[in-house]
Regions:
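Non-catalytic peripheral regions of patatin-like phospholipases
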Residues: 4, 53-90, 112-114, 118-124, ...
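Catalytic nucleophile loop
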Residues: 18, 32-49, 158
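Helix-rich "cap/lid" substructures immediately adjacent to catalytic or cofactor-binding pockets
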Residues: 1-35
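ATP/pyrophosphate-binding catalytic subdomain of soluble kinases
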Residues: 125-126, 132-170
């Protein structure tokens, strides 16, 4: 049994792939000794460190498009569209808050100090305060203000915090990056059917927008300009490109022992109603990565 220091990237709903990656690690006898996560990686990592990943996944399996919208406390402020508190409170109903230092597995979450332009690592205090700071995507979530500091999404500076893992317990570093470059084909996923694949391909190619799709589609539909060029969709695209480049740089600087790289454009950042599809894909990619190491 090998001990793992696990690093989980930011990436919105794409981060649901982290669930399957963890499941495959455990299935193959790896023991996760520590976790550091950013944004969605902080959510999944925190749930696992609390021993509640299965409960979190079960809850996510109840999420549909209507429920996504019900969890978004939308407010058209100058610096954000969603307050973010309803999501956290809903998660607390499934997994109660706990102090990070009391978790059975060492855990750290990464956020960004907006004024200083520095990464901030949460290693103690409220688990949900750390998660809320780490997921505060600019222009989408209300920034977190605490102790005179304004916290925003850790993905701005450090979407794949490999540098933090060097001080965490574990014999090998395993990283899951859901903002990878390149292309992949969902037809490789044995649990997908042809109709699902064709629908996703069409959606990706045409970037069709409608209120019935995702929260991003809904928010975009409220803006007056063309959906592909309004300020919100453009800012999110810029943010995603920045995250992708920073993650690639971290991989180059701090090479993990095992890397799972999932192309950014394979899943949308707001497809939270596809937990089974995305987590299954993450499990498949982890299986492939472990097979390559074993060989």
């Amino acid at each position: 049994m090998r001990d793992v220091a696990l690093v989980l990237s930011s990436g919105g709903a794409r981060g649901l792939a982290h669930i399957g990656a963890i499941e495959e690690l455990e299935a193959q006898g790896y023991r996760i000794r520590s976790i550091v996560g950013c944004s969605m990686g902080a959510i999944i990592g925190g749930m696992y460190a609390a021993g509640k990943l299965a409960e979190y996944k079960e809850w996510m399996q109840t999420i549909d498009k209507k429920k996504i919208l019900s969890l978004l406390d939308i407010t058209f402020s100058l610096d954000h569209l969603v307050k973010g508190e309803k999501i956290i409170e809903a998660m607390k109903d499934i997994v109660p808050d706990v102090k990070i230092e009391d978790l059975p597995i060492p855990f750290k979450a990464v956020a960004t100090d907006w004024e200083k332009g520095q990464e901030v690592v949460f290693s103690k205090g409220s688990l949900y305060e750390a998660i809320r700071a780490s997921i505060s995507m600019p222009l989408f979530f209300d920034p977190v203000k605490k102790g005179g500091t304004t916290f925003v999404d850790g993905g701005i500076l450090n979407p794949l915090p490999l540098n933090i893992s060097k001080d965490m317990p574990g014999d090998i570093v395993v990283a899951v990056n859901v903002s990878g470059t390149g292309e992949d084909n969902e037809n490789d996923n044995e649990n997908d059917n042809e109709n699902d694949n064709e629908k996703r391909k069409t959606k990706t190619k045409t970037k069709t927008k409608s209120k019935a799709q995702t929260a991003l589609d809904f928010l975009s539909s409220l803006l007056p300009d063309e959906p592909d060029v309004n300020y919100f969709t453009m800012s999110q695209r810029l943010f995603r490109l920045m995250v992708q480049k920073n993650a690639a740089l971290n991989i180059e600087l701090y090479k993990p022992d095992i890397l799972v790289n999932i192309p950014m454009d394979l899943f949308g950042p707001f497809e939270y109603d596809h937990v089974d599809k995305i987590s299954t894909y993450g499990r498949k990619k982890m299986r492939e990565a472990l097979k390559n190491i074993d060989n």
